UniProtKB/Swiss-Prot annotation:
Organism: Chlorobium luteolum (strain DSM 273 / BCRC 81028 / 2530) (Pelodictyon luteolum)
Matching SUPFAM superfamilies: Obg GTP-binding protein N-terminal domain (SSF82051), P-loop containing nucleoside triphosphate hydrolases (SSF52540)
CDD domains for this protein: Obg
Chief location category: cytoplasm
GO annotation, cellular component aspect: cytoplasm
Protein name from the UniProt record: GTPase Obg
Residues binding Mg(2+): S173, T193
Coiled-coil region(s): none
UniProt feature, compositional bias: Polar residues: 129-138
Acidic residues composition bias: residue spans: 331-343
Alphabetized InterPro entries for the sequence: G_OBG (IPR031167), GTP-bd (IPR006073), GTP-bd_Obg/CgtA (IPR014100), GTP1-OBG_CS (IPR006074), GTP1_OBG_dom (IPR006169), GTP1_OBG_dom_sf (IPR036726), OBG_GTPase (IPR045086), P-loop_NTPase (IPR027417)
Residues holding GTP: 166-173, 191-195, 213-216, 280-283, 304-306
Span of domain OBG-type G: 160-323
Length: 343
């Protein structure tokens, strides 16, 4: 399936139904009063997250979503039926903006989350509402109100706990395929990964975390070079970054610093995320290879996805970091002795 992470659609809520002009018809009542019913409200437009969706591809083929109008009012004070609401399913992690103003309307992260994005128009009033002491038989009613309409810009940011960052051929795809059931394309040439991949990493009993592999970034990515920059948004929501550098690199620490520099240039909080340095392909490391010490309290791990070396230690470290950031913050006043308390 083609991966699409941005789309623009037009949505229009339903118009309200017309109010009715009608008069009571009863035997022996030659001049019955007005009894025109109100029109029904138009249908609303909702956005709803669906965890089974992973792309905005559907919106490349369907650009307009229109909710039904409300039914018109009828005689005998019968109101029209409300127009049916429509629901538009989107992947978890979708941001929705008003295309005209770029105002953020919704940031939808949880499965099954629903947001009303356009409200249907009110139904018009029937002539029963316009009778007065001087006009007992009004022939006036109201048309329905128009429903809200707007153009939406949608952007997908994948939901993951761990983001893999590295130069092309650093071993990101191999690692995610070994740790999870994800099966990205793997080959011995640069830019094998052309779209982000998600994998669920199982950890001990009943525990798991989600890992995201994005296309490799290169020096100058912040200025638009390479493929990785356009996909960096997909690791903005992660709790920790694993920066992968191959052990056969000319200078492992220099590559690490280059990658960190690109994250800093991109901004949007990526440079502030906790990170670990993962030195990959240790099975082909030179005999005199030594692990770098980049400082800044960065934990350094050495692994080989092919040989299985260091993978348990890596999973342990990633789980520790993820679970630590999942915990609710502890109260700074555990004894309940803060000022102003009631005994």
């Amino acid at each position: 399936m083609k991966f699409v992470d941005s789309a623009s659609i037009f949505v229009q809520a339903g118009e309200g139904g017309r109010g009715c002009v009608s008069f009571r018809r009863e035997k022996f009542v030659p001049k019955g009063g007005p009894d025109g019913g109100d029109g029904g409200n138009g249908g609303n437009v909702w956005l709803r997250t669906n965890s089974h969706l992973t792309t905005l591809l559907d919106f490349k083929y369907r650009k307009k979503y229109l909710a039904p109008r409300g039914s018109h009012g009828q005689g005998s004070r019968k109101s029209g039926r409300k127009g049916a609401d429509i629901y538009i399913d989107v992947p978890c992690g979708t941001l929705v903006r008003n295309a005209a103003t770029q105002e953020l309307l919704a940031d939808m992260t949880g499965d099954g989350e629903e947001v009303m994005i356009a409200r249907g128009g009110h139904g018009g009033r029937g002539n029963q509402h316009f009778a007065t002491s001087t006009n007992q038989a009004p022939r006036r009613s109201e048309p329905g109100w128009k429903g809200e309409e707007l153009q939406l810009d949608m952007e997908l940011k994948l939901m993951a706990d761990v983001g893999l960052v590295g130069f092309p051929n650093a071993g990101k795809s191999t690692l995610i395929s070994v740790l999870s059931a994800a099966r990205p394309k793997i080959a011995d040439y640069p830019f094998t990964t052309l779209v982000p991949n998600l994998g669920i990493v199982r950890y001990e009993e009943y525990k798991s975390f989600v890992m995201a592999d994005i296309p490799g970034i290169i020096e100058g990515a912040a200025e638009g070079r390479g493929l990785g920059l356009q996909f960096l948004r997909h690791i903005e929501r992660t709790k920790i970054l694993a920066v992968l550098v191959s052990a056969d690199a000319e200078d492992v620490e220099a590559e690490y610093q280059t990658l960190v520099g690109e994250l800093e240039k991109f901004g949007r909080g990526l440079d502030e995320k906790p990170r670990i340095l993962v030195v990959t392909k240790m099975d082909i490391a030179p005999e005199d290879f030594t692990l770098p010490a980049p400082g800044d309290e960065v934990h350094v791990l050495a692994i080989s996805s092919v040989a299985g070396m260091g993978l348990k230690e890596l999973k342990d470290e990633l789980w520790r970091e993820v679970s630590m950031r999942d915990r609710p913050e502890e109260s700074s006043d555990p004894e309940g002795e803060g000022d102003g308390g009631t005994p």
